[in-house]
Curated annotation (Swiss-Prot):
Gene Ontology molecular function, alphabetical: flavin adenine dinucleotide binding
Sequence positions that bind NAD(+): 271-285
Similarity section: Belongs to the MnmG family.
Pfam entry (one): GIDA
Organism the protein comes from: Malacoplasma penetrans (strain HF-2) (Mycoplasma penetrans)
InterPro entries hit by this protein: FAD/NAD-bd_sf, GIDA_C_N, MnmG, MnmG-rel, MnmG-rel_CS, MnmG_C, MnmG_C_subdom, MnmG_C_subdom_sf
GO terms, biological process: tRNA methylation; tRNA wobble uridine modification
Record carries keyword NAD: yes
Listed Gene3D superfamilies: FAD/NAD(P)-binding domain, GidA associated domain, C-terminal subdomain, tRNA uridine 5-carboxymethylaminomethyl modification enzyme MnmG/GidA
PANTHER family: GLUCOSE INHIBITED DIVISION PROTEIN A (PTHR11806), PROTEIN MTO1 HOMOLOG, MITOCHONDRIAL (PTHR11806:SF0)
Keywords: Cytoplasm, FAD, Flavoprotein, NAD, tRNA processing
Domain of life according to the entry: Bacteria
Gene: mnmG
SUPFAM superfamilies: FAD/NAD(P)-binding domain (SSF51905)
Protein name according to UniProt: tRNA uridine 5-carboxymethylaminomethyl modification enzyme MnmG
């Protein structure tokens, strides 16, 4: 028998964050994995980041987590998304070398004396008086601890579906977790059956890239990590490509829907609304002449590409027809066929905001087992579960992030308060405070918590505070520098008392234009210069946003009887339209309690009603 401070089941994105954050405080962790090849595995898209998700990765970094550093060290391409839009929507996305990513984490585990990686299946959890005592592995070894974090991902009672074939396996043909799934049900935890999928992998050298649209990275130095920054030169970055479906492909799919596991009743689990299979896209969006497909490298060491956007549960022969009808893929060779995977998840309303279960003390669930989708959503849950175990070990107050502090706070509050019916994906539209939850300010929002918990080093904290002081001094100087006393700055205005701060609010000016006229000009690096621009330009919008949010109070008195079809309401999500048209709530308060409806939807419904009232 071995005793540990905490046990973690699963070494995917959630499990790794949980283990490393505890090890950072020198707590001994046993990290269980079915196979060492599954450490940091990316069974689907080989990327980190994206809208909202890339900001989560930076939030993880600000709290002392690992994902940002791992992604920076194993990137194949880095891209700033939505750069033509406002900074509130900016997010980083890195194409990752999936083999190097796993290897990077394995090396970090080997170097860490506080993490024991144990490649054994856990088949049962031991409890006494509704408290965790430890776990048994399949060879009947017992590992003792008062804390257990379960991060089994999509492995819990998993089944692979290709056409009408059903295989009791986990992702990437690894074994699933069936004994543990059985015990969780026997403990009367409410479970839900979910489904996700992955597209085919194609041999790189069988594609005619001249027929595809090039998608390069961003030619500027960006990193997920705030301190351990590592950049990949633009000329060394891998190129991605865009391809498209066409009417012939749509015809093939429609003619073979009876062979799809999803459409022939073989799958009962609900699939992800925001990452539908190609069958779903063709059926649900039958007015579309084509759908985008993303041609992305998986690793420098692999001969395959990932064909994003073509996830499917159709049989192999139909997949062959589909792929060969994509322009540029006429001679393509499929090395690994697409499949759907069905698995058990926990209904997360059974959790506290700390991710500890209400039923059993010391038992935490984190990651896709809580009904989420995506590596970033999983990683942040693992981090928060690990931090809250740490808080209990040190008799601290739990760390529960608010919705206006982090996307992590939005995610966890949504999970524990709203019924999950399909895999939950973070979206910018879910965050009512999204102008405050930006890519550029994760450190300003969260670094203090990481430092207080001892998860951020003193040197990094000192570096941050020095930069913050320079940032604040720059803002003060911009506020006090007027056209009258900065005559060298050419600006067409008769008001000589106009400050550079006021001018910088305009979209056609940036901090670079002001910098030559400031005494503080040499103390900020590029990252903090961008912060100055964004802070000033978004100040007014953030105040307006807060006013609108405050106006949604007392929403139970706002009646919705005048709305016959929510398709008429602009700027609400498709999910909101679908669900509100089904439920037909009587008041805005009732609408707020419908799963999948967020504050942004409520604000836009209220604005619609106000505008409608003005017109009558």
């Amino acid at each position: 028998m071995k005793k540990y401070d905490c046990l973690v089941i699963g070494a995917g994105h959630a499990g790794l964050e949980a283990a490393f954050i505890l090890a950072k405080k020198k707590y001994k962790v046993a990290l269980f994995v079915l196979d060492k090849k599954l450490v940091g595995n990316m069974p689907c898209n080989p990327s980190i980041g994206g809208p909202a998700k890339g900001i989560v990765t930076r939030e993880i970094d600000a709290l002392g987590g690992m994902q940002a550093i791992a992604a920076d060290n194993t990137q194949l391409q880095m891209k700033l998304l939505n750069s033509s839009k406002g900074a509130g929507t900016w997010a980083l996305r890195a194409q990752i070398d999936k083999l190097e990513y796993s290897k990077w984490f394995l090396n970090r585990i080997e170097e860490n004396e506080y993490i024991d990686l144990i490649d054994k299946e856990v088949n049962s959890i031991k409890f006494v008086n509704q408290k965790v005592c430890g776990v048994y592995t399949v060879d009947n070894q017992f590992f003792e601890s008062n804390y257990l974090i379960v991060t089994t991902g999509t492995f819990l009672d998993s089944s692979i579906h290709i056409g009408h074939k059903v295989i009791k396996k986990g992702p990437d043909d690894f074994n699933g977790s069936y004994l543990l799934a059985k015990q969780i049900k026997e403990l009367d935890f409410q479970t839900i059956r979910l489904k996700t999928g992955t597209p085919p992998r194609i041999l790189k050298n069988s594609i005619d890239y001249s027929k595809l649209q090039i998608e390069p990275g961003t030619n500027k130095k960006y990193s997920f990590s705030h301190f351990d920054r590592k950049f990949l030169d633009f000329n060394k970055q891998e190129v991605c490509y865009l391809a498209f479906t066409n009417n012939k492909i749509h015809e093939i799919i429609n003619n073979n829907l009876d062979k799809s596991a999803m459409y022939s009743g073989f799958i009962t689990g609900t699939g992800p609304r925001y990452c539908p299979s190609i069958e779903d896209k063709v059926v649900r969006f039958n007015d579309k002449e084509r759908h985008q497909l993303f041609v992305e490298p998986e690793s420098k060491h692999l001969d395959t590409i990932y064909l994003g956007g073509l996830s499917s549960s159709l049989p192999e022969d139909v997949q062959e027809q589909i792929v060969k009808n994509i322009v540029g893929f006429e001679n393509a060779v499929i090395k690994k066929y697409a499949y759907a995977i069905e698995y058990d998840a926990i209904n997360p309303i059974q959790l506290y905001p700390t991710l500890e279960t209400k039923k059993i003390k010391g038992l935490f669930f984190a990651g896709q087992i809580n009904g989420t989708s995506g590596y970033e959503e999983a990683a942040c849950q693992g981090l928060m579960a690990g931090i809250n175990v740490l808080c209990q070990l040190e008799n601290r107050e739990p760390l529960v992030l608010k919705r206006n502090e982090a996307y992590i706070g939005v995610l966890i509050e949504d999970l524990i308060n709203k019924e999950i019916t399909d895999p939950y994906r973070l979206l910018t539209s879910r965050a009512e405070y999204r102008l405050e939850l930006r890519n550029d300010n994760a450190d300003q929002r969260l670094l203090k918590y990481g430092y207080e918990l001892g998860l951020i080093s003193q040197s990094h904290w000192d570096e941050y505070n020095k930069n913050l002081e320079n940032f604040n001094n720059t803002l003060k100087e911009l506020e006090t520098s007027t056209l009258k006393n900065v005559k060298e700055f050419k600006y067409n205005s008769r008001k000589t008392n106009t400050t550079l701060y006021e001018i910088l609010k305009r979209p056609d000016y940036s901090f670079i234009d002001m910098e030559p006229f400031l005494k503080n000009k040499n103390t900020l690096d590029e990252y903090w210069k961008d912060k100055v621009d964004i802070y000033i330009k978004y100040g007014g919008y953030i105040k307006s946003q807060q006013k609108i949010i405050n106006d949604t109070k007392n929403i139970d008195n706002i009646k919705l009887s005048s709305i016959s079809d929510y398709k008429d309401v602009p700027n609400i999500s498709l999910e909101a339209r679908d669900k509100l048209n089904k439920v037909k709530p009587l008041t805005l308060g009732q609408a707020s309690r419908v799963s999948g409806i967020n504050l942004v939807d409520l604000i836009n419904i209220k604005l619609y009603l106000e505008n409608k009232k003005k017109q009558t």
